[in-house]
Amino acid sequence: MNKAHLDQPLFKLDNFSFMYNTSETASIHQLSLSIYENDITILMGASGSGKSTLALCLNGLYPEAVEGTTKGNILYKGKNIAEYPRGIINQEVGIVFQDPESQFCMVRVEDELAFVLENLAIPRSEMKKKIKKVLQQIGMLEYIDADIHRLSGGQKQKIALASVLLMEPKYIILDEPTANLDPMSRLEFIELIIAIQKKTNTGVLIIEHQVDDWEMYADRLVVLSKDNHILIDEKPETAFQLHQNMLRNQQIAIPMKYLDNQETIKKVSHEKSMPVCLEVHHLHYYQKKSAILKDISFSVKQGEFITILGENGAGKSTLLQCLIGLKKYHNGNILFQGKDLQAWDRKILSKHTGFVFQQPEHQFICDTVFDEVAFGMRLNNYTTSEINHRTISLLQAFRLLDHQWKNPFTLSGGQKRRLSVATMLDETPDLLLFDEPTFGQDAHTTKELMNMILELQAQGTAIIFVTHDMDLVDTYCERALVIDKGSVRFDGNPQSLWNQKELLQDTRLREPYRVRESVKREVVHMQ
């Protein structure tokens, strides 16, 4: 550990194990760990190492909310967590998930926050004051009457945090809270958490795969191994400096500032002579008379890799869904392989295209992981031998073979994401669209996925890729399209984009680490 504590730990885990009844192996295995009330602790581990399960056990939701068994003990304030009256732990240990919508019950912001206070039996006469106070605290007072579904991802995450803060928790758990946020919303959310922590002295547990923007604030780094044991428990700086090989072996992303040599990936460049795969002409899309997409025009060639960037709520996901025919646009037209998109037979179109959703659960329709991957092949009349061979190959490539007979909805967040990508790769499609496919993924899986995408690109598949990861864009992508308030603000090489400071600021983007460090070195040299 990083510092001596004379006080009693807030949490004390003593050989604690948790196993889902549907699993043959424990998700958490004999963990012994002390967590202190005022510390900022980062929890890292490969996808499926038990991080989220541990968070839900600390919060008191598990094992009560699922079918699972525990061994050992979790003590909270020196008392076994199971001995507390129902609801006490949930109130004192707040949790914010990576998908804020999974926490919302109401339509309007004020009603959502009032619902929390009603459950705490707060008199109605006091509610308005408390709601305004917490919204003021997170900088969202002007949205008190807003519909939650109209808020951006960053704004929704702040409302989820406000719901937790209203309970005046003793401890806050953040389970990948910035995974879906644009670069500036991510920084703002982190700064908000740190400001709240300093003001209230509330302890925070941060579960993340990428901690470049968090680690400077943390007192402690705890790393769970792939076999669900504690591998590292010390200061982040010490761990990232001294244990890089160990962390890489455990598929942990090391913050870039600790890496001496940045890996260089050779980008796959499409042949300029390749035919056009997709054409978009003056596309407009409206929602309740509001223009979500305005006069969008661009084209994509076979074998081209385009990333679509923009702040939360800019229209990126809507554009992807229009491009694949999931949303019906109102003006303009889209041509795929020279033919109007709306004229294509849906079954034939699905053979040539693939779409990976932002939320993996939105595309699951089968009871087992194996059947989920095999589903498209069965629709396309593959032989049983072909289905078995191809499905097993994909499950191995995405490290899901050991989970092939599980229900997709019981997988970890990272495993669900890998499955959602695998289901789209039963053939080599002409066009693949990805909506933030790397969020929630460990470093190893992200690299594997990107290598697989580069292989598809080299075979002629056109790739359209939405992401908030600027380092990933800098490393892999040859062309960037920036959407701002529904319109195209930039279309060109990412290297050109990094030089346009005003545009980056307007669209809430950020230079990748490589560029930021280069600028710092130039400033130091000039001094």
From Swiss-Prot:
Its EC number is 7.-.-.-. The keyword Translocase applies. It is a peripheral membrane protein. ATP 2 binds at residues 310-317. Keywords: ATP-binding, Cell membrane, Membrane, Nucleotide-binding, Repeat, Translocase, Transport. GO terms for molecular function: ATP binding; ATP hydrolysis activity; ATPase-coupled transmembrane transporter activity. Pfam families: ABC_tran (PF00005). It comes from the Bacteria. ATP 1 binds at residues 45-52. Residues 11-251, 278-510 form the ABC transporter domain. It is found in: Cell membrane. GO terms for cellular component: ATP-binding cassette (ABC) transporter complex. This is Putative ABC transporter ATP-binding protein OB0804.
